[in-house]
């Protein structure tokens, strides 16, 4: 009798465990992307300006256009002035009723005083949304001691993938806290969701983005400020080296629109429904399967780059 009760109890626990994960996965996939309606971003932001870093290409540029479409003035920040000027012109041609400003900034090797100067410019306007998008990847996946560019490249990737989200958030929050309103979105990567051989620095820096965003949401969420970590998989951008779209690979415009619609519904999500499906499946796989898949992906990326450059990668 005792054995029967024990077996029944274990069975019930297993069923509840499976049911819990099924409900969690279903809500993570369908909640932000199907069930929930987009919130009033202007009301939650509490101000009319949106700042976007890494705004002249890919996801950052698409965020800038989508925010302009939704009526925000846009302050774009990137390294190259000519590209900033061109992006500003493009935005105003489509959305002439908003204002666009820009600031040139090299995120790879800034001093604290450089950040203070940038923040002084940004804080001239009332910022309701901050999109910390700027980021960097290596030329191709590689073991730490073999990374192309050596410790200089390693330092650049570490700095650019961690400091901007941290320091710009710290410098703009003093605007948002008194208003009890504001939105800060930090763009990470699905690469931060698993430990990845040959992606060690990139994966670790993207995990940092996810982690600090979660910490800051707990610090400031009760004050009316939204923090969100977006962890996309493959998006058809120049940085990804893949201009072709597919069911699992949206273009950056489609992605940015989808990701903005999840604000207020998920503090950490991939930003796109098929990416969320990939993410939830990834979490169910054993490590050895993930490791094998990552190894194959890394080899394919190196092979593709070698083919483009007509030389082997050692």
Swiss-Prot record:
Pfam families: adh_short. GO terms for molecular function: oxidoreductase activity. It comes from the Eukaryota. Keywords: Lipid biosynthesis, Lipid metabolism, NADP, Oxidoreductase, Steroid biosynthesis. The keyword Lipid biosynthesis applies. The active site is at residue 202. One of its GO terms (cellular component) is endoplasmic reticulum. Its EC number is 1.1.1.-. Gene3D superfamilies: NAD(P)-binding Rossmann-like Domain. GO terms for biological process: fatty acid elongation; steroid biosynthetic process. InterPro entries: NAD(P)-bd_dom_sf, Sc_DH/Rdtase_CS, SDR_fam. CDD domains: 17beta-HSD1_like_SDR_c. NADP(+) binds at residues 47-76. Belongs to the short-chain dehydrogenases/reductases (SDR) family. 17-beta-HSD 3 subfamily. This is Putative steroid dehydrogenase 1. It comes from Caenorhabditis elegans. The lineage of its organism: Eukaryota, Metazoa, Ecdysozoa, Nematoda, Chromadorea. The gene is stdh-1.
């Amino acid at each position: 009798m005792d054995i029967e009760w024990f077996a029944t109890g274990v069975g019930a626990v297993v069923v509840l465990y499976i049911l819990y994960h099924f409900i969690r996965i279903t809500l993570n996939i369908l909640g932000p992307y199907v069930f929930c309606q987009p919130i009033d971003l202007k009301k939650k932001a509490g101000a009319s300006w949106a700042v976007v870093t890494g705004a002249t290409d890919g996801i950052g540029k698409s965020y800038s256009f989508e925010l302009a479409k939704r009526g925000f003035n846009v302050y774009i920040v990137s390294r190259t002035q000519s590209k900033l000027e061109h992006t500003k012109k493009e935005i105003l041609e489509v959305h002439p009723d908003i204002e666009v400003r820009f600031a040139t900034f090299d995120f790879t090797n800034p001093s604290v005083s450089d950040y203070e100067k940038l923040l002084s410019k940004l804080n001239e306007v009332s910022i309701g949304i901050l999109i910390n998008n700027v980021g960097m990847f290596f030329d191709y996946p590689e073991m730490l001691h073999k990374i192309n560019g050596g410790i200089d490249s390693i330092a650049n990737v570490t700095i650019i993938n961690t400091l901007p989200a941290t320091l710009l958030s710290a410098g703009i929050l003093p605007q948002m806290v008194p208003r009890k309103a504001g939105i800060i979105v930090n763009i990470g990567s699905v690469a931060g969701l698993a430990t990845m051989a040959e992606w060690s620095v990139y994966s670790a820096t993207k995990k940092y983005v996810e982690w600090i965003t979660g910490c800051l949401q707990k610090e400031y969420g009760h004050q009316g400020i939204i923090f969100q970590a977006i962890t996309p998989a493959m998006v058809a951008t120049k940085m990804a080296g893949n201009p072709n779209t597919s069911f699992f690979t949206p273009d950056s415009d489609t992605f940015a629109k989808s990701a903005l619609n999840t604000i207020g519904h998920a503090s950490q999500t991939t930003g796109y429904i098929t990416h969320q499906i990939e993410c939830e499946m990834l979490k169910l796989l054993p490590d050895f399967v993930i490791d094998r898949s990552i190894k194959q992906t890394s080899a394919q990326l190196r092979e593709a780059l070698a083919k483009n450059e007509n030389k082997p990668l050692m």
